[in-house]
């Protein structure tokens, strides 16, 4: 019996390794990894450039608090800001943490311009944003929120593809 929490209905497939966009099961079958580890493996499996960067950094520092200056973090933030719309970067540990940061940033923005009551966020019903309290309520999924009351308020939901419902 597995000691892992039963938060997924696991398939009876076990993977031993991956290469690029493909996964290889323990019985030797090749699969296209269209899920990409729930969208976290965008560079593919066993990416040689990523392996090299991880190995190089692991020999220096693993992590220190963001209360300190980390030269490699500064360098990466500069590169990302230069190639995107962003003026500054905040690194997050997960998609849920990034979503929480986006919720807070949106609410703080309207608070800072004197519109604190403008705090509701539109979300696609039955979407997935993570497993924190705020992100499960952002999902609009009864299955995900059942038993986790009281409700985290501030989210309005619309059906995916139903543009008319956005006018409400």
Language model segments and positions:
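Short, contiguous strand/loop micro-motifs
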Residues: 10-11, 37-38, 63-64, 131, ...
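Short secondary-structure boundary/capping elements
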Residues: 15, 46, 72, 158-161
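Short, acidic, Ser/Thr-enriched surface-loop or helix-capping motifs
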Residues: 25-26
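Active-site-adjacent loop/helix segments that line or gate small-molecule/cofactor pockets in enzymes
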Residues: 1-19, 36, 67
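A generic structural signal for short, non-catalytic loop/turn and secondary-structure boundary residues
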Residues: 16, 33, 150-151
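Glycine-rich loop-to-alpha-helix module at the N-terminal edge of alpha/beta enzyme cores
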Residues: 30-116, 120
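PLP-dependent aspartate aminotransferase-fold enzymes
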Residues: 78-168
